[in-house]
Amino acid sequence: MELPRAFGLLLHPTSLPGPYGVGVLGREARDFLRFLKEAGGRYWQVLPLGPTGYGDSPYQSFSAFAGNPYLIDLRPLAERGYVRLEDPGFPQGRVDYGLLYAWKWPALKEAFRGFKEKASPEEREAFAAFREREAWWLEDYALFMALKGAHGGLPWNRWPLPLRKREEKALREAKSALAEEVAFHAFTQWLFFRQWGALKAEAEALGIRIIGDMPIFVAEDSAEVWAHPEWFHLDEEGRPTVVAGVPPDYFSETGQRWGNPLYRWDVLEREGFSFWIRRLEKALELFHLVRIDHFRGFEAYWEIPASCPTAVEGRWVKAPGEKLFQKIQEVFGEVPVLAEDLGVITPEVEALRDRFGLPGMKVLQFAFDDGMENPFLPHNYPAHGRVVVYTGTHDNDTTLGWYRTATPHEKAFMARYLADWGITFREEEEVPWALMHLGMKSVARLAVYPVQDVLALGSEARMNYPGRPSGNWAWRLLPGELSPEHGARLRAMAEATERL
């Protein structure tokens, strides 16, 4: 896949500024798109948009297809008289997910009651048409969420056996008893997709493409695992027998045990990879390009026995990545995927990526810990430039935070390397812009930078600490924090490096 020479910014919608505790798909999102356009940017990258649960991670979602109701802008519904909005005193600059949960769900339910009382015939018709059109995933998701609520939030594999096993009589009775709750969860999805669709149309009108993010694995407690246990390695109780993760390495003696159930690739292949085709189809309704997290798992994945508390006991198991991407190519033509190819990357993984012409990733924070052979140093990027260069990702510290904890060797090497590229800095606060300049100067077709680096923020603005169970995903922009001066500086840098 060929990318234009361009740049973009990474900002998850929850991080947008505004009232009511979390960024939403409203005027602040449109303001950000206009800022990006003025700055000369052509891409907006987001994290996964699915509904989040315990831990608030976008990478552990209740659904592979649904959108996050937290992102719904309630102000248009308040203007229609469906809901009254009162800010309970949300903090500025951070998402308080406990407070958000306690406020937003009741507000959404009030909006649903208002909709039922006051909606026009056209709106009712539009909602009914959405439910019918999306029934192939929406029915399972809405019932899953309604049942979850009815069972105190318990994961599906701890529900009563007839519901766990999806016995026909139990499902029929649940749909009848919980019809209002099911309709409510369908309503939240209608609102989400309507608002996201309007935002995507605005991005397209401004010449901005949206890069989405898709986790390779799905969460154990998700509608898909409940509805299609045959796709996963589960026992009779519906619990995973083997789980996903990565092996021990330099950074972790015990590796990482993510806990996601692993696919039964033989079953998915027999079904023509229909789950993956539909997943990608849905993603491409939302985005123009899709970054797939942990791309190496399509070549081989680390399989950990579910009984093991760490990732040490795992083993590599081959996956049918080539067959899957051939099928994707048949269906979509060009494969609109960016490969997150970080971590344990073998020649086989590189061959799979290159066979389908998928752009990989380069992270500048990884470039300075050894010598000139480091593949993250820009002079080592492939001449075709089919890579996306980042200062850091959501899993990294901010660039200023990283620099403050870098070794003296890394700092000295970085300063020398930047000087070789004609880039100098005096204060540590200038380091994020120096690295952004380096990425812009490189042959990488696309450069994408976290907004925290545009603002030269420290570790207090870090989005995620991998392995830390709580306190992540909370950083937010303050109103007016991104200024026209930031935009002008980005535009000048893009113009000087031929990225406009």
Swiss-Prot record:
It is found in: Cytoplasm. Disulfide bonds: none annotated. Keywords: Carbohydrate metabolism, Cytoplasm, Glycosyltransferase, Transferase. Its main location: cytoplasm. InterPro entries: Glyco_hydro_77 (IPR003385), Glycoside_hydrolase_SF (IPR017853). It holds the Pfam family Glyco_hydro_77. Belongs to the disproportionating enzyme family. It catalyses: Transfers a segment of a (1->4)-alpha-D-glucan to a new position in an acceptor, which may be glucose or a (1->4)-alpha-D-glucan. One of its GO terms (cellular component) is cytoplasm. GO terms for molecular function: 4-alpha-glucanotransferase activity. Its EC number is 2.4.1.25. This is 4-alpha-glucanotransferase. Coiled coil: none annotated. GO terms for biological process: carbohydrate metabolic process.
